[in-house]
Swiss-Prot record:
CDD domains: LDH-like_MDH. It comes from Sinorhizobium fredii (strain NBRC 101917 / NGR234). It catalyses: (S)-malate + NAD(+) = oxaloacetate + NADH + H(+). GO terms for molecular function: L-lactate dehydrogenase activity; L-malate dehydrogenase (NAD+) activity. This is Malate dehydrogenase. InterPro entries: L-lactate/malate_DH (IPR001557), Lactate/malate_DH_C (IPR022383), Lactate/malate_DH_N (IPR001236), Lactate_DH/Glyco_Ohase_4_C (IPR015955), Malate_DH_type3 (IPR011275), NAD(P)-bd_dom_sf (IPR036291).
Length: 321
């Protein structure tokens, strides 16, 4: 039986980490693509040379021609410019929109049956544009955001309570930006809701709000520390979790930027919501009940994403279709 084929479009820090993780998990053969010739080939060769030590079997190749991604089962898109200190994700819009147009054309031509995971920022607007540029089915194009944001929330909670990260569940909804909505009411420690833990004296409401704000600022905190780039280990791990759910038909319940067609009162936009990911791509969108405050925060986040999509249309009017 032929191995799955995974195309990594963009071979920067996230792309290289994706290739390593996909190899370690033996998810399939891996193609690293980048317009900067030599970088994908070099990283592919370097990671391949680690396979005898780490004990995985996968073919890794690098390319600067989209023809190399032909027939890919999964495409993970990281191409574009990363954030630098003082920049918001939204500052990247104009540059990365042009990149998405090129990437969309490449995927449409060579990998039209792939499950596509977009990581490029500003995430919600870029995945929306990528789906339109590529013409792929909406359930086969998703954005990686919620898994990462929820992972950050889970880590901070585990550190606060001094418990294992494995015992924390957390949900973050909305756009991947300053308006994201970490949902304390739907987050638990070993099944115990955070709201109950406040009543039990484990944490104050004020401290919990500080953790929620740190989650919102999670990416910016790392950008500020690195000074020359943005996060790559956790984003790569998050995207690999999504790819694995698709390739192995795991039916994982994962928050991601999915296309909404009326759910949560949102139409023709990509926003972070809980989904079921299996062999059919996004097989289901889970609509959870939101209280008044949560709904207001979610709607504010949706409004921010809508503004970015409108800005995209201003740059590329063809997206209005």
């Amino acid at each position: 039986m032929a191995r799955n084929k995974i195309a990594l479009i963009g071979s920067g820090m996230i792309g290289g980490t994706l290739a390593h993780l996909a190899g370690l998990k033996e998810l399939g053969d891996i193609v690293l693509f980048d317009i900067a010739d030599g970088i994908p080939q070099g990283k592919g060769l370097d990671i391949a040379q680690s396979s005898p030590v780490e004990g995985f079997d996968a073919t890794l190749t690098g390319a600067s021609d989209y023809a190399a991604i032909e027939g890919a089962d999964v495409c993970i898109v990281t191409a574009g410019v990363p954030r630098k200190p003082g920049m918001s994700r939204d500052d990247l819009l104009g540059i990365n929109l042009k990149v998405m147009e090129q990437v969309g054309a490449g995927i449409k031509k060579y990998a039209p049956n792939a499950f596509v995971i977009c990581i490029t920022n500003p995430l919600d607007a870029m995945v929306w544009a990528l789906q339109k540029f590529s013409g792929l089915p909406k359930n086969k194009v998703v954005g990686m955001a919620g898994v990462l944001d929820s992972s950050r929330f889970r880590l901070f909670l585990a550190q606060e309570f001094n418990v294992s990260v494995q015992d924390i569940t957390a949900f973050v909804l909305g756009g991947h930006g300053d308006t994201m909505v970490p949902l304390a009411r739907y987050s638990t420690v070993a099944g115990i809701p955070l709201t109950d833990l406040v009543q039990m004296g484990w944490v104050t409401k004020e401290r919990l709000e500080e953790i929620i704000q740190r989650t919102r600022d999670g990416g910016a905190e790392i950008v500020g520390l690195l000074k020359t780039g943005s996060a790559y280990y956790a984003p790569a791990a998050s995207a690999i979790e999504m790819a694995e759910a698709y390739l192995k038909d795991k039916k994982r319940v994962l928050p991601c930027a999915a296309h909404l067609s009326g759910q949560y009162g949102v139409k023709d936009m990509y926003v972070g919501v809980p989904t079921v990911i299996g062999a059919g791509g996004v097989e289901r969108i889970i609509e959870i009940d939101l209280n008044k405050g949560e709904k207001e925060a979610f709607d504010k986040s949706v409004g921010a994403v809508a503004g970015l999509c409108e800005a995209c249309i201003g740059i590329a009017p063809s997206l209005k279709q």
